[in-house]
Amino acid sequence: MSVLVAFSVTPLGVGEGVGEIVTEAIRVVRDSGLPNQTDAMFTVIEGDTWAEVMAVVQRAVEAVAARAPRVSAVIKVDWRPGVTDAMTQKVATVERYLLRPE
């Protein structure tokens, strides 16, 4: 099974410069050992089970909460039994379609 989660965590009440605090969440994700990617808006993480992935998301939110009085989180889940490597396969599929002549 593949559980693919895109999430963002935003510390509130700490001023405009939040990059250093958000880095704590990214560190938790990277230290988890699960496949992940971070872009300007979200971090995507993939695991075999809901519990495995959501435990990492929870630790990431807690890492931000340790440094901010309030935290906002946006979470999107793609739960797809029978699929592996969804994070790269979904992008690869779109890239293949882009190579087709119109």
UniProtKB/Swiss-Prot annotation:
Coiled coil: none annotated. One of its GO terms (cellular component) is cytosol. SUPFAM superfamilies: MTH1187/YkoF-like. Signal peptide: none annotated. It comes from the Bacteria. Disulfide bonds: none annotated. Gene3D superfamilies: 3.30.70.930. NCBIfam families: MTH1187 family thiamine-binding protein. Belongs to the UPF0045 family. This is UPF0045 protein Mb1933. It comes from Mycobacterium bovis (strain ATCC BAA-935 / AF2122/97).
